[in-house]
Amino acid sequence: MKIIKPIILLFIITFSFESYSQDNNRIVSNIQDLVLDVDESFTASSVTMDDNDNEVSCNNMIYYSRNREALDVNNETGEITANSPGFFTVVAICIQEGGKRLRKDFSVKVNYPPVNKIKISLINNVLYTDSYIPLTFEVIYEKGFIRNDVKFNLTSSNDLISIDNLNNVKAITSGKSTLTAEFEGITSSIILNIKKNPVSYIELKSNSDEARTGDVFQFRAVAYDKKNLVIGDAPIKFSFTGKSFDKSNTASGLIEKDGRFVGDVAGQYIITSNVGNISASKIINVIDRNIKRKFKSIGVGTVNDKHTSDFWVFEGVDGRDYAVSGTWGADGTTYFWDVTNPSNLIKIDSVQVDARTVNDVKVSEDGKICVISREGASNRKNGIIIIDVTNPYDVNIISEYTQNLTGGVHNVFIYENHVYALSNGEKYYVINIDDPKNPKEIGKFELGKPGQSIHDVWIEDGIAYSSNWRNGVYLVDVGNGIANGSPSNPVAFANYNYASGAHHATFPYKSKSTGKFYTVLGDEIFPNGIDVKGQNVTAGFLHFVDFTDLDNPVEVARYELPGDGSHNYWIDGDVLYVAMYTGGVRVVDLSGDLMGDLYKQGREIGYILSGSENAYVPNSTMSWGAQLYKGHVFYSDWNSGIGSAKLEPIKPDKTKASIN
């Protein structure tokens, strides 16, 4: 074992992985039921009380916000500043004697400012009788905030339209009608020009009559008038009903406004296109995808005295296969393994550094350099460690680099002799390692937003995929040339985010079967926090975003495993290998167009549970990551170490269904 410095264990750990006191003390604070206006500030004051309402000593009370961009909180002073309206959570943590932590979440409401105006828009300017009118409503507040989830009071100037209790507006008779929306005393109106429905009949066709669950049908509908002339701008809508072949199941699927349909469950489906009261239907069959294969555990490399973090498998300069794995919340140890025989994973060397957590490990493409991250260093310098792994049986530390990385490094990536290292969960720095003994910082990337945060960065083809929690994924040119960026001048050129704000990792891939370019965005959610000694509850899923049009990314599909949350993953050859924390390692078919809920569609090929009775936390699966390497699926498990598994060969497809 190599040791870079003596280890002094501190009770330092990131908030998302804290261990909390289980006694009956509680935090009482003046931010209970706090209500603020936008731009208003308030200073929190909190004490800790026991069951008898006596104040209990608290060495330090710290605060943080679940949404720092909208509600900024000074961790030390407790000053809270409201930047955006809505409901938010402020977490108060009392650090007690012996390092015990007591926590309480407080809800803070930030009022919306006065309404400035209401905007009403037509989604489609062609309005026919006997049709619902597609409208969008926005409330625009002072200070520029926009909201579209309020209940308006809608009225009409005449009886040419009807308005139901859910504010759906239907065209009844041809002519002009004025629709008025009112909210908080502010009104806005729009004139609706309604025409008599000219559609006589609709011709509905599809690219296939039968396909598997998960395969996408394309329906095309053409509207004609009484003279058999095409009505090109007819507002055609699509819908479906279905009946499962399995009487104990319920048919389900998804249909888009452009006529694409996917069935989740095998059954018979009726697809309908309509313009007002004129419709056409077509019956299709959806059969089982039938892609299950045996997925077997091959070998394990047990770590039973501490938690395991990330890992990386690589080919050494000697042509043999090796792996490196980090450890979490322990003593800063990194392990090296010989995995040439996947059924016999052999621990061959280790390095111990001044850290509690070595969260991430990466190896250069030539198999010569390993970079590991540090968090919880006793001297608070943290940073990265650069290691010579030309002989994995006898690895040697080359250098450490801490400049601008003292707040802790959670993830790293090596690309073309540059290390991209996260700094304190806020930004990443680019460090040149042409001379690994003398690493040099040459660039950095940050969003430049209040409360900016980042969890991961992944690089392919000169593009860095920066995973920024609430701000989603940023595509950053670090040498690709698409935005004239470079390692010393990273330039963001595309972005996508989603409502949960839990975006933790990104994996880009181009579909081999369709040519479409996707980024797969993963959540990381622990609804009840982390239990370092027992079973955990995890949540979240993978979001599939079609980035073929960089200016208009579209979220098209998800992989969500009921009851288990996502973590790290790998894609190769239209197959996904994903560690679903408590749900184990899952293998998922990504062939063809992707649309809807991939799990419901039966796209899962197989899975293993990675827990072990000899683990640090016995019989408790907590799969951390997966990597396909030379035909085997390697993985790490937070509780048990590393392992390998293998899929049986693909069986010939005997189904007759196909999408033409």
Describe each PLM feature range.
Residues I4-I7, K119, T308, T538:
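Residue-level detector of intrinsically disordered/flexible regions characterized by low predicted structural confidence
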Residues I4, N83, N111-Y112, Y132, ...:
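Selective for proline/serine-rich intrinsically disordered segments
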